[in-house]
Design a protein with these regions (language model features):
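Histidine-centered divalent metal-coordination motifs
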Residues: 25, 29
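S-adenosyl-L-methionine-dependent methyltransferase catalytic module, highlighting the catalytic core
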Residues: 32-171
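Short, well-ordered alpha-helix to beta-strand connector turns
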Residues: 1, 18, 46-47
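Hydrophobic beta-strand segment of the Class I
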Residues: 21-22
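Conserved SAM-binding strand-loop segment of SAM-dependent methyltransferases
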Residues: 1-12
Length: 171
């Protein structure tokens, strides 16, 4: 595998270059004016399926704004990802309003708003963060089962599975 550094709105790959494309926790960092271009590029280089996951909508943005304020009130430096989250409003489901008819969309809720806020506040404290990571290593199936229970609405993050309805026509 070879790492390629590029801009998401100008991918240096041929049409339908990959069977699947995964874009995880990226769209909220893309300026709103470039998001449609990123989606167009991802669809262009994907042959069969695209999976995008991101914090979705105004309610998710507000949760991160509260978290950001919590860091400030404790005189703690917010993580870089959280600082970046404050730069642009989060995309919502309408990001796919112009989805070509050759693609179908499935939406999977991931992590409730309440759980995300609770968990991120716990991670502010090193003993809790360490304990959770230890638990994840020792009993991963138990943790996974628990985490599945919090994948529902109102969701902080949504996962969009876009599937091409038929084989692409190669130009």
């Amino acid at each position: 595998m070879r790492a390629v550094r590029c801009s998401g709105h100008q991918l240096p790959f041929a049409n339908c270059a990959f069977d699947a494309v995964v874009v995880s926790d990226v769209m909220e960092h893309v300026p709103p004016g470039l998001r449609k271009q990123v989606i167009e590029e991802v669809l262009r280089v994907a042959r069969k399926v695209v999976v995008l996951g991101y914090p979705c909508g105004a309610a998710a943005f507000e949760v991160d704004r509260m978290l950001y304020r919590d860091y400030q009130s404790r005189n703690l430096p917010p993580p870089v990802w959280l600082q970046e989250h404050m730069l642009h409003p989060f995309p919502d489901e309408n990001l796919f309003g112009d989805l070509p008819t050759t693609w179908k969309r499935k939406i999977i809720p991931n992590e409730t708003l309440r759980f995300h806020y609770w968990m991120m506040r716990k991670e502010m404290f090193r003993p809790w963060d360490y304990s959770f990571r230890l638990l994840l290593r020792m009993v991963p199936r138990f943790v996974e089962r628990f985490l599945r229970r919090v994948n529902r609405e109102p969701a902080y993050r949504k996962i969009f599975v876009l599937t091409r309805k038929s084989e692409p026509v190669y130009a």
